[in-house]
Amino acid sequence: MKKIAIFLFEGAELFEIASFTDIFGWNNIVGLKEFRDIKVETISYKEEIKCTWGGVLKAEKLVTENNIEEIFSYDALVIPGGFGGANFFKDKENEIFKKLVKHFYENNKIIVAICTAVINLVE
């Protein structure tokens, strides 16, 4: 089974999150059989995030220093973009996020940053 973690930042764009959950969700039902075994999970350093235009999402998995190693086993890290006016860039220096990105980068794992999320990768 392949596992994809979608990292939720405060102020993320709901559509940019939903595109991954929807595509891979449907893929597991109607996609080619050899690609159906993909698990997508939303993760964050917060239990809930408020999206750009007000929707609230609860992360499926809260990532802490105690369980970050579990996320290191995932195959890909997706970072949806967001809006600065909704505090999207406020927590880009979060240590948990930085450790995840560093691990995925150093281990040649897939990192997908959508739109403004690229800014959160710049150090």
Where are these regions (language model features)?
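Short, thiol/selenol-centered motifs that function as redox-active sites or metal-ligating centers
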Residues: 114-115
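Extended, subdomain-level signal for the structured scaffold at the beginning of enzyme domains
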Residues: 1-109, 119-123
